[in-house]
């Protein structure tokens, strides 16, 4: 939307928080970045130390830590100790929610020791990992073996547990689905302290399908077995500029990975990686990647771009150059490609450090980047948090592929946020209805990208300050999110709950399906022990009444029954 087309809004009167946010870069440079670098280095040393340990030692430590969690759960007094949650501080999580449920009465269980890669099974092509293993840690181990998780979320600090209990996506999700779709087994400690292993075809198959998106409210995840795939040393990346309106961009994006003849499972026609970045209502760059060998990448005439070096142009800005120079192809080392958005936090780094993209800063201080999201959250008080909720948007909309154009037009009209990130993912038709699910009958009228067993969706990632805020105008962030959520419910979309949500409980369960989740809450004793997923996601501090009602929930509550997965 151009400035002439933008709706007239009154100017917003500046308050003291505006000036603090404007000059927050001082705190970031002199405090947050040095501490972040130190923490990254210490974490790296801990990871290396763990890798040196034998499988037997790591498994022994894992078993001991599991027993500690079991013992801790058994010490809980339901009448006075509160509902169970992890002992992680509210600011540690990468998500944008305030984790307000930890500001009320609760019973903490420490899962911090669960950060080891337990085994890489090359024969079964499975990685067995603990929940606090992060993406940077796992790729450092697997990529030298020419292996990788089927879905590697871009940011280094994202953990396996968060990607399973919450939400995780990457440019390969148009082939493999969301991160949780690549998990073959969950190891869960239930409310009674029992340790169970849930797979899609054992006695805990209902729990297996209910865990994703449950936010840790069915049990405590202590390990997971995740699919590995073979990879090559480089990613051959093609940058294709697109100029047109938002519907044109949406169609070009769809065409970049979804054959119009419906042959979606043909690897010859479908690239290994896909993403599109939209820089304005009329300009975008579609990127497609295919794994390539070292020999191919180093052939005469091919360009290799080591995007991981600290002084390199931030990736989203590098991709934007395609709009000036036209289509081009280059080869990026695979691990550097996986984490291409880490150093600049997509484009959020530009707001945190307005001059951070300048060559002089990148060359002198780029090695300190990125600031840890947890430290950014730890150094902001209540007023700053509320300011960001009102004046800044970090939201993902999971939208059916054929509705992406509509979603882009809605976002442009209501928020005016650019760049926008597009990343496709399969939403599988499972043997049992889960919290998120494809549209009924999609397989009978398959649209572009759909297959017989999966509907193609897209993550429309909206991360930045809205246009009205950048122009100094009045903007109601909470109301904008409420409108977004209403549009999503009407259009069979889903909102990842790492973000700030304005949904009330009724609308939350209009967006998500409660059947299997509530069935497993009752069956496995989570009610009255673990918080409900809405309780955890609800915005705002919990009142004493809300805490008491959640604690006193009992197992004879009327939950909807669901069909069990077929044997």
From Swiss-Prot:
Compartments in which it is found: Membrane
Tissues showing expression: Highly expressed in the apical region and root tips and lower levels in immature and mature internodes and leaves.
Organism domain of life: Eukaryota
Consequence of changing residue 560 to A: In strain: cv. Torsdag
Catalytic activity: lathosterol + NADP(+) = 5alpha-cholesta-7,24-dien-3beta-ol + NADPH + H(+)
Topological relation to the membrane, as annotated: Single-pass membrane protein
Alphabetical GO biological process terms: steroid metabolic process
Induction profile: Not induced by brassinolide.
GO CC annotations, alphabetized: cytoplasm; membrane
Protein role: Plays a critical role in the general process of plant cell elongation.
UniProt protein name: Delta(24)-sterol reductase
Naturally occurring in which organism (per UniProt): Pisum sativum
